[in-house]
Amino acid sequence: MKHTFFAYLARMKYIKRWGLMRNSVPENDAEHTLQTAMIAHGLALIRENIFHEPCDGEHCAMLAVYHDVSEVFTGDMPTPVKYFTEDLRDRYQEIEDKARERLLQTLPDELKKAYRPY
């Protein structure tokens, strides 16, 4: 079996995001993911070091890195559409869950447990 996990992740740079507002510069999933991870990490560090509340910055950053990986199979859907009705939101969540599981199946068994939390 070929392990194509990282090849699929490399596709994120080809997935165009749906901006909620008119954007002067289009954004792809890879760019969005990097920005999200940096912000998540920074906010976690602020929580831990300024507000003195426990928060694992590295874990937050990794959650952000993998938060849109299902889109390598589904593409991006505009947020207003995704949440238009409760039923549509639930159905789309099922699709995203199946896409994430499909992606996990491209990993060797020894690595699946390490990636599953994300």
Model-derived segments and spans:
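Short alpha-helical hairpin
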Residues: 2-20
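Short linear capping/connector segments at secondary-structure termini
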Residues: 23, 81-84, 115-118
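Alpha-helical phosphate/pyrophosphate-handling elements in metalloenzyme active cores
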Residues: 24-58
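An active-site-proximal "capping" alpha-helix that borders the catalytic cofactor pocket
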Residues: 36-43, 96-105
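Active-site alpha-helical segments that house and flank conserved acidic catalytic motifs
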Residues: 38-44, 58-77
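Aspartate-rich (DDxxD/NDxxD/DxxxD) Mg2+/diphosphate-binding motifs
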Residues: 53, 74-86
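Histidine/acidic-rich helix-loop-helix segments that form or flank divalent-metal centers
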Residues: 58-62, 105-118
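Divalent-cation-assisted or electrostatically stabilized phosphate/pyrophosphate-binding catalytic cores
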Residues: 81-99
